[in-house]
Amino acid sequence: MKSTKKILAALASIGLVLTLAAPMLAAQSFKSPDDVKTALKLLVQVSNDFKRQINNKNFARVPHEFMEYTEAADALRGAIKNEPADFKNKVETRLKAAVAAYQKVSDMSAKATDPQPLMAEHAKAVTAMNSLFDLFPADYRPDPNLPPPGRGGAKKNP
């Protein structure tokens, strides 16, 4: 009886470890890893552009940034199109939430005269975006504090 309990406990432990490790293992073997990294980087860059436009009180430009954000979201969808359905569904759910949050910032910008409410809403959008990024391995997630190439960022070698 005791040995049966020990075996069941060991199997349960192994099952738990495999269950927890499976998403991480699946996520680390993307079929298009460079495309995934590029799409995630684009999302961060456009988010930073949102912030810059709001801080500069260039509210009329914010809807254009939203359009670019949706293009970056589509790039991510394309980058993961050959991944397992379960992973794609998780990404799509969080991606839709992030896009909706950035759309709210864009919609608010039409009547904005003060950057503070937009910045508060932008912070919520960033939280939604970070929730999306949590689905990806840490080495795929871009550093939001690095400027993009061409704006003081790293230059690519030809």
Model-derived regions: residue spans:
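Short, solvent-exposed, charged loop/turn and helix-capping segments
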Residues: A72-R94
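N-terminal secretory signal peptides that target proteins for export/translocation
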Residues: M1-K6
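Amphipathic, well-ordered alpha-helical segments in soluble domains
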Residues: A39-V46, E68, A72-A75, A97, ...
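Non-transmembrane, amphipathic alpha-helical segments
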Residues: Q28-D35, I54-R61, E83, F87-K90, ...
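Bacterial N-terminal signal peptides
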Residues: L11-A21
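Surface-exposed, polar helix/loop patches in the mature regions of secreted/periplasmic/lumenal proteins
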Residues: D86-N145
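Immediate post-signal-peptide N-terminus of mature secreted/exported proteins
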Residues: A26-M67, R141-P144, P148-P158
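Acidic/histidine-rich, surface-exposed loop or edge segments in extracytoplasmic proteins
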Residues: V44-R52, R77-K81, Y102-M108
